[in-house]
């Protein structure tokens, strides 16, 4: 019991019990009323935790939210887009014209084997690599 006495803390469990742990004091400041089926929940009811407080009085709080709409607002239709009726372009969408952006539209294009053979036949330095020459000794 000595350890339990040392661990007892007023901030956690309230004042120390008078005789033994089974006889904890019931505080009148923590009284909870049984719900009578009203619209109030336990979180919405007022509780007092002070020593010299008056009996509880139910405080009903009402809140309202008003949404102010602009003068030209039409509730049934979607707002007009400032960009017009064209959808936004994705970097992965096909280009509008192959000549519009230089080599940029073809940057992610997969090269076919026929392109590789055309470059090799043209004498391009970036053509397919051939096997290294064999050296005789």
From Swiss-Prot:
Polar residues compositional bias, start-end: 32-43, 127-137
Name this protein carries in UniProt: Dormancy-associated protein homolog 3
UniProt biased composition (Pro residues): 88-97
Positions carrying Phosphoserine: 81
Listed Basic and acidic residues bias regions: 104-118
InterPro entries, A to Z: DRM/ARP
Segments of skewed composition (Low complexity): 70-87
Superkingdom as given in the UniProt entry: Eukaryota
Family: Belongs to the DRM1/ARP family.
Pfam families documented for this protein: Auxin_repressed (PF05564)
The organism's taxonomic lineage, starting at the top: Eukaryota, Viridiplantae, Streptophyta, Embryophyta, Tracheophyta
Keyword Phosphoprotein: yes
Presence of keyword Phosphoprotein: yes
Organism: Arabidopsis thaliana
Region (Disordered): 1-55, 69-137
